[in-house]
């Protein structure tokens, strides 16, 4: 039997938030990189 969801390990929550934040930053970085590459290709 799993404990109810109301009992959440604070550390788990923190880790989840951290992972989400990292993933979001990487996505932002990737889109920026793609845009840079596109601009470079356009100028060639």
Swiss-Prot record:
Modified positions (Valine amide) in chain numbering: 44
Keyword Secreted: yes
UniProt GO MF annotations: hormone activity
Cellular component GO terms held in the UniProt record: extracellular region
Locations listed in the record: Secreted
UniProt entry keywords in alphabetical sequence: Amidation, Hormone, Secreted
Subcellular location, principal: secreted
Pfam families: CRF (PF00473)
Family of the protein in this entry: Belongs to the sauvagine/corticotropin-releasing factor/urotensin I family.
Chain's role: Regulation of fluid secretion. Stimulates primary urine secretion by Malpighian tubules and causes a dose-dependent stimulation of cAMP levels in the tubules. May act as clearance peptide in that it may remove metabolic waste from the hemolymph.
Protein's name according to its UniProt entry: Diuretic hormone
Record organism: Musca domestica (House fly)
